[in-house]
Amino acid sequence: MTFVLQDSCIRQKWPYPTLKIKGGPRCKTLRNVERIWAFLMRHEATRHDMLLCVGGGSISDLGGFAASTFKRGIRFGIVPTTLLSMADASIGGKTGIDWQGFKNSVGTFHKPTKTIIDTRYLQTLPEREFLSGMAEVIKTGLLSSYEDFYATLRALEDGHISEELILRIRAIKSDIVRRDPREKNIRQWLNLGHTIGHALEEAGLQWGRPIPHGYAVMQGLVAELYLSVMKLNMDRQPLRLLTHLMIEHYGKVGYSCKDYDRLIAFMRQDKKNTNHTIRFVLLKGVGEPVLNCTAEEAEIREALDFLFTL
């Protein structure tokens, strides 16, 4: 039997028992996981049943984690309704919730049984959600090639992304995940922009100024491309292009040098770190990611200076 977990903002009816939870960055809580477990238990769900998650990336992260832990794991499917979830969050089997203020600090690998892509959901997507998704799309383009990177920038400028480009971005990420399903090596490439991005996102949540995941990732990409220029001598042109588009479409960053200590403290909690050292994915060039890059605190502060003074 199928059970549905759906973002309460979506007005779609299913012929299955449905639990509605408001999506967004605040929904990935242990309390909501318990609500899903109770819903499944109340309807006598078995290990042979499936939980279908309808919504953005936060709903699939939340529902996937609940499914992976209910009765030691039941199947789950995803109907992504945002660009972010279509192009990124619905791929790869990562699930998780935020705990004690830290992003995705509790989670599992649990691959969805099915994913249903329907781009008609994007026709009513608010601009803010489109921009949030485009940050992950651009990140994947940066990891791939100049051709893909420029295609993603054109989509951002046009305010529209084609189904062909969505499928291309999904294929790039899916290939990386296929080659490294447990994130032991090259799958960590997908964390480009996320060391600083997650710190900004966590800070926003804890300080009562939440920002969309993709906005934080876009800011993280700009700062980490700056580090790439500084540390790996990457050509500055991708940084110039991305900086211009971030200012034009995403606005300025609402932090200052007074926040550096706390932001760096968040970075120290990043799951990529080893030996208490903050680690980054940086670029030698477009399509040339480098794992396990380190930076001195002074260098991180310089990158934040660049970002915050734009």
Which ranges hold each PLM region?
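A glycine/threonine-rich phosphate-anchoring loop and its flanking beta-alpha core
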Residues: G64-E157
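Generic secondary-structure signature for well-ordered alpha-helical cores
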Residues: R42-A45, K111-K114, R120-E127, A135-E147, ...
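Glycine/serine-rich anion-binding loops at beta->alpha junctions
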Residues: D49-S68, Q188-L200
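ATP/NTP phosphate-donor binding region
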Residues: M1-M50
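C-terminal charged capping/lid subdomain of soluble metabolic enzymes
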Residues: A135-I138, M234-L310
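Non-catalytic interfacial helical region
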Residues: W37-V54, G63-I78
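Active-site segments that bind and position negatively charged phosphate/pyrophosphate groups
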Residues: A151-D261
